[in-house]
């Protein structure tokens, strides 16, 4: 019988391994990306804000109440004049908002007609893509505690909210690909961003600590153990920091944890007082003073008795608090009734009313005592674990002594950096918090305005732009918060800078940051935390100061959406049979029964108690399967703390995993439908808290070794990477810094941007001839990154040739460049508009009498043309050519007209061909957008990199006849130095080149180089041998090398050359965009110092600073230094009066110079830099008298 069961078990395991094969899981992954997309976390959270959060904010906020007169339309009720109503008398009026409605974006034409506004037009007109928020205003009269409805004002505008593209409120929602093309949008534009003043803005997620969750930790080894909780109310946003501190003995201050005082006291730390409050006093206020109650709240283990007895003794001592000296901080905010009360009553009021605001206004003493008791229990358990660490370790190693009681008392310190204790605020949550702050001030502003007018007038509300301007300020500046507020976060709304490729924009949309300064010295927070695996990409983070602070979501990572705690509590209460309310528990019941009870927490708030916590977890899973609860609701049981935590708050990291038990039981999985797998329970979402209590297999190798251990499985191991790192071929065959470098450089790789021809960003770079990579990953294919490539497959030879490719230099084939290899076009947009505020500008062809010394021949000179005075399309413009002719007209007091030429001139960085001109208007002001195209051929100094982070700059461009060649005449496109491979250990580039060579030989268009393939996990070296063997079968050398001839003499090269296709990128760092020098004819000077200007924008040169000066002195070229820093800089001649030793009173006359101070003519001249002369004047202005002594005078 046992053998039969074992055989059945083995058979089931084999069937399971067959069911969850890599092929099936990749099929599931493909459907997930097609249905969910990569910006789901942005779109869903914003939709939740629009359809739920705005209504919640308005319902939770107090109504507008003021003394005044009714609106004029409310004087008649039910067709008759209301009895006793006097229109001249003021009444107590209340205005309530309901039926919130957010319209779709619209725009008003010049003839006042309204039509839909689309994103392309918003970009073109440089306006914000936003929509109106309307409410119905109910007007009540408060009389004798009765609310009398006297009027109802429909569709009153209260704000304009920026709308996220492709969200449910966007006009592009549910549009077909063809319709989006007709509306000027790209087919693959994912949305998830905003358009503010014509610029695209992305809200960057903000990582923070979780609210309403206690964390026990020790800051430093010598500091006391603390248990912190930031309690925040869902309704009001009011928060309080509750901190419990275990007072260690003086021995513990010497960093000897094994000798901690076992009778240490516990204090409550709050911001309202600087002096700690004994926990015994807090329990006394909460009417917990007996040992039985404390055992029920904290625990009945013998190890905790000494602490409980001490608390009871202190609680029964009435003078323990009276003898303390309480210092209330200046930030105290108690009401007027308690200002004359004693300090003891103030603390008592805080404990009874303000402590744990997330429990609600109606929370009882019992609920607060339970929550406080659980925090005390956690604190004591961690303390006992620290004291008895060796004993617990010894018991853990001894199988015979491993008892349940030992496990119950073992609880280590918690990690604040653990992702189960973190929340990320995405677009919807950020808008929710900002709108709530603005709405509170909006209500106060309306009350003030209505009281001034002394009447209900809807234009006061509809014309109040407080919310609109506040939202516009935050979105346009990136400073998130209400102006003149202490708490404003910077850099939340950002303009995507690296929009040079398709994948780089997705990376921006999936970014989140830790809001701390880049100069922060905390290195631990920058390190990769084990709990972040499959949530945050371990490779995609910038180098330098922002390392570990700017992060990106992994491929399957999502963010939970808030579900009200009240709804969750009602469902749990109705569905769980062992549920008990707090008030139903009596201490007279069986103590054994009480010891089995576990507290149910919903988002940190107390829901009830249960004697069957495991059954509750099962009930929650069934409710999720029946769609009674959302898929992102999580439930975990912590036996050491006797707590069940059900989480439905927003911002939790969640991801889908395979439910092995469901797959075993049901089978017949539809792997091509992610939604079907989710509905049938084959796929479940888990957050970081649930994952800590789960056994998840990463691949089939883990599952086959321990099939009975794992309850879940990852969909694919490569999903631990982010958008950019997941595109790197064979990412597991290179060192981790290379993945980080490539994730950053791939964002700078110039590619083909969707719909770039209809957008007019400030600078857009597009590669002319892009190619799909021969070797790529499954994730890149599934998300269609290869449909918009950012490089090409170059034939690369790895060899030392001429010496010009040393130190990461690259030799390029000139003939390949002539055929279009790596050609890039840079589009620069110049915006010119007619200014009407303060000046009177007009775009036209300036008359000859007012023109400057510029070229006006390229302008349209037909007055009937709508482009009169604007440069013609397809014209080649260069420096000092006029792009747009503009004239400023001023009328003097005597009536004469004076015209001044104010035309827009081409600068040195804007030379090129006029690609297109867009004529539009913004708020009635004429505007032209001129797009100039610049052709960028590869040249010496330009930067390139492979898809495996082998970067380099062009060191030489060789003629094709000088390049090495093979026997069949094949010539490489580029030559790289072989020393770059062993030093950087980029084995994946060698593998990708071999696979690409095989693909070319077999006429295959796709070589699968996905990381962590099942076939290469057991023995990675077998994968390399298999690639080489396959190449050999195609007729090439096993190791990928080729015999090549020298390009100069045709002789055979001694060494065989590794030769094959490698996917290469051209980066945005180009010499033509950075090189600059100052012309000798440039006479531009600084207005104050009279020194030449430096910098490319000022047409200046490199500034000679202090260090440059020292280097030139070392080289012995002091004459050159004198010439550059004096003769050609700010040379100045000073006339000095020798007797007065000053030059301030020397004046020039017809007969020469004389001193007006002493009437003398003993004047000498000396050379001096004008900056020094300016310094002398500043010293004189500060009251310092300067005297100049002349030698031999």
Curated annotation (Swiss-Prot):
MF annotations from Gene Ontology: DNA binding; DNA-directed RNA polymerase activity; ribonucleoside binding; zinc ion binding
SUPFAM superfamilies found in the cross-reference section: beta and beta-prime subunits of DNA dependent RNA-polymerase (SSF64484)
Lineage top rank: taxon: Viruses
Top enzyme category: transferase
Zinc finger (C4-type): 1137-1158
Entry EC no(s): 2.7.7.6
Record Pfam families: RNA_pol_Rpb2_1, RNA_pol_Rpb2_3, RNA_pol_Rpb2_4, RNA_pol_Rpb2_6, RNA_pol_Rpb2_7
Record: residues binding Mg(2+): 808
Keyword Ligase: no
Gene3D superfamilies for the chain: 2.40.50.150, 3.90.1100.10, DNA-directed RNA polymerase, subunit 2, domain 6 (2.40.270.10), RNA polymerase alpha subunit dimerisation domain (3.90.1800.10), RNA polymerase Rpb2, domain 2 (3.90.1110.10)
Record InterPro entries: DNA-dir_RNA_pol_su2 (IPR015712), DNA-dir_RNAP_su2_dom (IPR007120), DNA-dir_RNAP_su2_hyb_sf (IPR037033), RNA_pol_bsu_protrusion (IPR007644), RNA_pol_Rpb2_2_sf (IPR037034), RNA_pol_Rpb2_3 (IPR007645), RNA_pol_Rpb2_4 (IPR007646), RNA_pol_Rpb2_7 (IPR007641)
Residues noted as binding Zn(2+) in the record, renumbered to the chain: 1137, 1140, 1155, 1158
Entry function: Component of the DNA-dependent RNA polymerase that catalyzes the transcription of DNA into RNA using the four ribonucleoside triphosphates as substrates. Second largest component of RNA polymerase II which synthesizes mRNA precursors and many functional non-coding RNAs. Proposed to contribute to the polymerase catalytic activity and forms the polymerase active center together with the largest subunit.
Entry's family note: Belongs to the RNA polymerase beta chain family.
Protein name: Probable DNA-directed RNA polymerase II subunit RPB2 homolog
Species name: Invertebrate iridescent virus 6 (IIV-6)
């Amino acid at each position: 019988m046992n053998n039969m069961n074992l055989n059945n078990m083995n058979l089931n395991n084999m069937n399971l391994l067959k069911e969850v094969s890599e092929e099936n899981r990749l099929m599931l992954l493909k459907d997930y990306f097609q249905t969910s997309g990569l910006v789901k976390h942005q779109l869903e959270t914003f939709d939740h804000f629009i359809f739920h959060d705005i209504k919640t904010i308005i319902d939770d906020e107090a109504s507008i109440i003021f003394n005044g007169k009714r609106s004029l339309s409310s004087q008649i009720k039910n067709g008759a004049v209301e009895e006793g109503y006097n229109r001249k008398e003021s009444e107590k009026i209340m205005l309530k908002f309901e039926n919130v409605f957010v319209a779709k974006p619209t725009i008003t034409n010049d003839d006042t007609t309204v039509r839909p506004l689309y994103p392309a037009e918003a970009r073109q007109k440089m306006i914000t893509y936003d929509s109106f928020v309307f409410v119905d205003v109910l007007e009540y009269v408060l009389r004798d505690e009765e609310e009398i409805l006297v009027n109802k004002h429909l569709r009153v505008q209260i704000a304009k909210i920026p709308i996220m593209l492709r969200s449910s409120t966007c006009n592009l929602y549910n549009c077909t690909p063809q319709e989006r093309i007709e509306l000027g949008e790209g087919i693959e534009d994912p949305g998830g961003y905003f358009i503010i003043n014509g610029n695209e803005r992305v809200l960057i997620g903000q990582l923070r600590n979780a609210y309403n969750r206690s964390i026990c930790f020790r800051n430093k080894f010598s500091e006391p153990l603390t248990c912190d909780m930031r309690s925040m109310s869902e309704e009001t946003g009011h928060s309080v920091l509750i901190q419990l501190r275990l007072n260690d003995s003086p021995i513990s201050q010497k960093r000897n944890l094994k000798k901690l005082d076992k009778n240490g006291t516990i204090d409550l730390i709050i911001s309202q007082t600087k002096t700690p409050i004994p926990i015994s006093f807090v329990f006394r206020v909460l009417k917990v003073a007996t040992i039985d109650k404390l055992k029920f709240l904290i625990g009945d283990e013998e190890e905790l008795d000494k602490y409980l007895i001490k608390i009871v003794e202190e609680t029964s001592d009435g003078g323990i608090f009276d003898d303390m000296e309480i210092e209330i901080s200046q930030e105290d905010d108690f009401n007027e009734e308690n200002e004359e009360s004693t300090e003891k009553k103030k603390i008592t009021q805080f404990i009874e009313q303000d402590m744990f605001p997330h429990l609600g206004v109606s929370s009882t003493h019992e609920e607060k005592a339970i929550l406080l008791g659980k925090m005390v229990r956690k604190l004591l358990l961690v303390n006992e674990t620290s004291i008895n660490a060796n004993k617990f370790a010894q018991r853990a190693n001894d199988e015979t002594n491993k008892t349940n009681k030992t496990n119950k008392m073992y609880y280590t310190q918690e990690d604040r950096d653990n992702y189960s204790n973190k929340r990320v605020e995405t677009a919807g949550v950020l808008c929710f918090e900002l709108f709530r702050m603005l709405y509170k001030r909006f209500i106060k502003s309306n009350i003030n305005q209505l009281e001034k007018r002394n009447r209900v007038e809807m234009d006061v509300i509809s014309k109040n732009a407080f919310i609109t301007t506040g939202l516009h300020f935050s979105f346009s500046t990136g400073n998130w918060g209400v102006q003149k507020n202490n708490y404003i976060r910077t850099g939340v709304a950002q303009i995507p800078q690296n929009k040079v490729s398709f994948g780089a924009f997705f990376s921006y949309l999936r970014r989140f940051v830790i809001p701390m300064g880049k100069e922060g010295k905390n290195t631990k927070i920058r390190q990769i935390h084990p709990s972040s695996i499959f949530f945050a990409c371990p490779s995609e983070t910038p180098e330098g100061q922002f390392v570990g602070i700017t992060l990106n979501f992994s491929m399957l990572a999502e963010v939970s959406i808030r579900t009200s705690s009240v709804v969750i509590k009602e469902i749990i209460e109705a569905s769980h049979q062992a549920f008990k309310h707090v008030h139903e528990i009596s201490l007279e019941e069986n103590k054994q029964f009480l010891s089995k009870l576990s507290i149910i927490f919903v988002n940190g708030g107390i829901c009830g108690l249960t004697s069957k916590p495991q059954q509750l977890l099962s009930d929650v899973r069934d409710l999720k399967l029946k769609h009674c609860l959302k898929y992102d609701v999580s439930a975990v049981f912590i036996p050491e703390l006797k707590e069940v935590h059900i989480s439905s708050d927003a911002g939790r990291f969640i991801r889908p995993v395979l439910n092995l038990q469901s797959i075993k039981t049901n089978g017949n999985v539809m792997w091509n439908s992610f939604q079907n797998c989710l509905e049938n329970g084959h796929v479940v979402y888990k957050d970081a808290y649930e994952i800590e209590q789960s056994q998840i297999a990463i691949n089939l190798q883990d599952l086959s070794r321990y099939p009975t251990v794992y309850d879940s499985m990852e969909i694919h191991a490569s999903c631990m990477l982010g958008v950019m790192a997941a595109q790197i071929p064979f990412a597991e065959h290179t060192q981790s810094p290379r993945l980080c470098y490539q994730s950053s450089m791939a964002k700078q790789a110039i590619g083909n941007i969707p719909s770039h021809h209809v957008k007019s960003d400030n600078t857009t770079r597009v590669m002319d001839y892009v190619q799909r990579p021969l070797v790529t990953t499954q994730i890149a294919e599934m998300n269609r990154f290869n449909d918009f490539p950012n490089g090409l497959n170059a034939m690369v030879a790895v060899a030392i040739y001429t010496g010009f490719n040393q130190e990461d230099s690259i030799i390029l084939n000139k003939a390949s460049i002539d055929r279009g290899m790596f050609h890039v076009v840079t589009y620069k947009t110049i915006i010119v508009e007619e200014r009407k505020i303060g000046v009177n500008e007009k775009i036209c062809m300036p008359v000859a009498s007012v023109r400057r010394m510029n070229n006006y021949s390229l302008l349209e000179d037909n007055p009937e043309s709508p482009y009169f005075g604007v440069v013609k399309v397809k014209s080649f413009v260069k420096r000092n050519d006029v792009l747009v002719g503009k004239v400023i007209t001023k009328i003097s007091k005597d009536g004469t007209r004076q015209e001044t030429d104010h035309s827009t001139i081409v600068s040195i960085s804007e030379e090129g061909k006029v690609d297109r001109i867009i004529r539009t208007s913004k708020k009635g002001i004429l505007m032209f957008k001129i797009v100039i195209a610049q052709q960028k051929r590869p040249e010496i100094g330009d930067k390139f990199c492979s898809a495996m982070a082998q970067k380099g700059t062009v060191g030489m461009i060789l003629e094709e006849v000088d390049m090495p060649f093979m026997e069949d005449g094949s010539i490489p496109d580029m030559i790289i130095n072989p020393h770059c491979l062993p030093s950087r250990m980029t084995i994946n580039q060698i593998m990708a080149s071999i696979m690409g060579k095989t693909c070319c030989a077999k006429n295959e268009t796709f070589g699968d180089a996905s990381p962590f393939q099942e076939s290469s996990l057991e023995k990675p070296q077998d994968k390399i041998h298999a690639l080489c063997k396959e190449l050999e079968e195609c007729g090439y050398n096993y190791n990928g090398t080729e015999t090549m001839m020298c390009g100069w003499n045709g002789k055979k090269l001694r060494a065989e050359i590794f030769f094959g296709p490698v996917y290469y990128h051209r980066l945005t760092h180009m010499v033509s965009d950075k090189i600059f020098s100052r012309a000798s004819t440039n006479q531009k000077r600084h207005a104050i110092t009279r020194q030449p200007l430096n910098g490319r924008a000022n047409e200046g040169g490199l500034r000679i600073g202090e260090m440059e000066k020292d280097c030139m002195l070392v080289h012995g070229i002091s004459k050159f230094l004198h010439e550059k820093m004096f003769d050609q800089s700010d040379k100045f001649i000073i006339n000095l009066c020798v007797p007065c030793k000053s030059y301030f009173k020397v004046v020039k006359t017809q007969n020469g110079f004389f001193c007006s101070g002493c009437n003398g003519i003993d004047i000498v001249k000396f050379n001096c830099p004008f900056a020094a002369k300016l310094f002398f004047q500043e010293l004189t202005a500060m009251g310092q008298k300067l005297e100049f002594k002349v030698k031999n005078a």
